[in-house]
């Protein structure tokens, strides 16, 4: 097990390039980071060992072990470290697979010179010169085309490595696939037969067994990454708006593509070494506004919602009620985004005004058939079921027929800010005393979509973007939400 980790440890003494590239946290003497809270077991994509995983500082996904986490490396960095060199984005072509094979042959060669070098370093006891598997595990690294695949919404990212062992992948953000069919089985067999030809007979059999066992593995079904896969440990609440702290390794050197980077690895090693020596760790504070988080917040909002508010005589906003056992949800908004709180207040205040205008109800302790529909309005607010849910709620308010249209009365007091917002939604100078179903539907949707256009939101957080993209967004001032920027501007004005 951990053949890749052992190979990185021993081969780092072979060349100067190896000494810079093969430094991984799993081979260091650092104390491992405590991972008692993390119950995810899988393959660390940096050292390829099967162990307990923790969340990466760069992408907030669980893919790094408690030793490698101290290097703070991510496969989305632009520094050409080993993890980055093993990473390719879809589509995977034969040219990209050839780059992986060339990388292995460059960093982990097997020839008589390398074998003799290892014989000289392993000489404490006589048995260590007998080519036992225990002492020469680093020579048993076959070249395979297995990869851990992260399936983001619009792209797939492949991290190639030698992943040994088996483990259930229930909680892992990635799945293991075998890309040998995209290359050539016989050609890859020939590459490995040539590598193992220099090995002693007893190691050849072990090498061949490892190679054929892993190179013929079937691919797993890819798993799409959702917002729940990301860590919440690096989220901060700033102005009641959630931001995410992301750490990335930057270098001054740039490459147009990953294949160009591999071309320089073969033909211009000095450029790679210069890039590694000038790299730095940079912190980004990115907004966490995305469709995945909006769905999670709305689900939580619907779970904590107290629909009894629509029957009450409370004049305070729904989120501020604290002394009514039927309407109290104040504790639920301690960590909630302010936009969710604003939406909740306006939505329940508007529904309260409509409900009290049309239904004879006097207290929030009443049991009404509209209560489940209020929760459904929240849960379905950004789904395709919102129209039929709004219609059901509309029908509970005893609509009457006027000029061949169903209408409800609107004659209950509302907040001035909500009054102005409804005027803006309906594009009218004065609010009518009756609402049709279309008007009622438009107001509900307008309140929900006030702070963000769901159609334009990214599906996943910005921490899934490449480092170059984060740098560009930072230069354009798009890493923070507009609300945070407005606050910053007002503070500067003072």
From Swiss-Prot:
Location of region: RNA-binding: 1-83
Region feature Zinc-binding domain, mapped onto this chain: 44-81
A GO MF label: metal ion binding
Source organism, top-level taxon: Viruses
Disulfide bridge map: none
Record InterPro entries: Rotavirus_NSP1
Any one GO CC term of the record: host cytoskeleton
Major subcellular location class: host cell
Region named Interaction with host IRF3: 320-494
Database matches in Pfam families: Rota_NS53
Any one biological process term the GO annotation gives: symbiont-mediated suppression of host cytoplasmic pattern recognition receptor signaling pathway via inhibition of IRF3 activity
Localization per record: Host cytoplasm, Host cytoskeleton
Keywords recorded for this protein, A-Z: Host cytoplasm, Host cytoskeleton, Host-virus interaction, Inhibition of host innate immune response by virus, Inhibition of host IRF3 by virus, Inhibition of host IRF7 by virus, Inhibition of host RLR pathway by virus, Interferon antiviral system evasion, Metal-binding, RNA-binding, Viral immunoevasion
Chain intervals for the UniProt region annotation (Important for cytoskeleton localization): 84-178
Renumbered ranges of motif pLxIS motif: 485-488
UniProt comment concerning the protein's domains: The integrity of the zinc-binding domain in NSP1 is important for degradation of host IRF3.
Described purpose of this protein according to its UniProt entry: Plays a role in the inhibition of host innate immunity by inducing the degradation of key host factors required to activate interferon production such as IRF3, IRF5 or IRF7. Associates with components of cullin RING ligases (CRLs) including CUL1 or CUL3, which are essential multisubunit ubiquitination complexes, to modulate their activities.
Quaternary structure (record): Interacts (via C-terminus) with host IRF3; this interaction leads to IRF3 degradation. Interacts with host IRF7; this interaction leads to IRF7 degradation. Interacts with host CUL1 and CUL3.
Similarity comment: Belongs to the rotavirus NSP1 family.
Protein name (Swiss-Prot/TrEMBL): Non-structural protein 1
């Amino acid at each position: 097990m951990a053949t890749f980790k052992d190979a990185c440890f021993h081969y780092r003494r072979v060349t100067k390039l190896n000494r810079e590239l093969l430094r991984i946290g799993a081979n260091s003497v650092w104390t491992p980071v405590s991972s008692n809270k993390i119950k995810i077991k899988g393959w660390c994509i940096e050292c390829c060992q099967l162990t307990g995983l923790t969340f990466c500082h760069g992408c907030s996904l669980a893919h790094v072990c408690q030793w490698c986490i101290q290097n703070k490396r991510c496969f989305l960095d632009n520094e050409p470290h080993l993890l980055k060199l093993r990473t390719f984005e879809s589509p995977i072509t034969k040219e990209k697979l050839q780059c992986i094979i060339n990388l292995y042959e460059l960093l982990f060669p097997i020839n008589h010179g390398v074998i003799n070098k290892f014989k000289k370093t392993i000489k404490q006891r006589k048995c260590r010169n007998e080519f036992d598997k225990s002492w020469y595990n680093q020579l048993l690294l076959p070249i395979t085309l297995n990869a851990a695949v992260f399936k983001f919404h619009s792209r797939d990212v492949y991290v190639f490595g030698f992943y040994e062992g088996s483990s259930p992948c229930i909680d892992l953000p990635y799945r293991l696939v075998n890309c040998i069919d995209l290359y050539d089985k016989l050609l890859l067999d020939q590459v490995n037969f040539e590598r193992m030809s220099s090995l002693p007979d007893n190691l050849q059999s072990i090498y061949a067994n490892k190679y054929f066992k892993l190179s013929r593995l079937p691919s797993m079904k890819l798993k799409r990454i959702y917002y729940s896969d990301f860590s919440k440990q690096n989220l901060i609440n700033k102005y009641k708006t959630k931001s995410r702290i992301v750490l990335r390794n930057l270098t001054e050197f740039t490459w147009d593509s990953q294949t160009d980077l591999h071309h320089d690895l073969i033909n211009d090693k000095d450029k790679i070494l210069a890039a590694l020596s000038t790299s730095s760790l940079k912190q980004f504070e990115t907004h966490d506004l995305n469709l995945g988080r909006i769905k999670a917040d709305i689900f939580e909002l619907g779970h904590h919602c107290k629909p009894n508010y629509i029957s009450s005589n409370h004049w305070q906003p729904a989120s501020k009620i604290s002394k009514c056992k039927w309407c109290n949800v104040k504790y639920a908004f301690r960590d909630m985004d302010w936009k969710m709180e604003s939406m909740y207040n306006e939505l329940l205040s508007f529904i309260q005004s409509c409900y009290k205008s049309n239904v004879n109800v006097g207290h929030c302790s009443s049991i009404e058939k509209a209560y489940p529909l209020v929760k459904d309005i929240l849960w379905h607010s950004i789904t395709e079921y919102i129209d039929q849910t709004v219609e059901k709620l509309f029908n509970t308010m005893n609509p009457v027929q006027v000029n061949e249209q169903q209408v409800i009365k609107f004659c209950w007091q509302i907040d001035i800010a909500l009054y102005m917002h409804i005027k803006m939604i309906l594009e009218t100078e004065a609010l009518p005393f009756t609402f049709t179903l279309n008007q009622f539907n438009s107001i509900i949707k307008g309140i929900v979509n006030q702070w963000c256009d769901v159609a334009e939101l990214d599906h996943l957080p910005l921490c899934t973007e490449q480092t170059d993209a984060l740098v560009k967004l930072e230069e354009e001032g798009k890493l923070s939400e507009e609300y945070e920027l407005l606050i910053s501007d007002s503070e500067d004005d003072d």
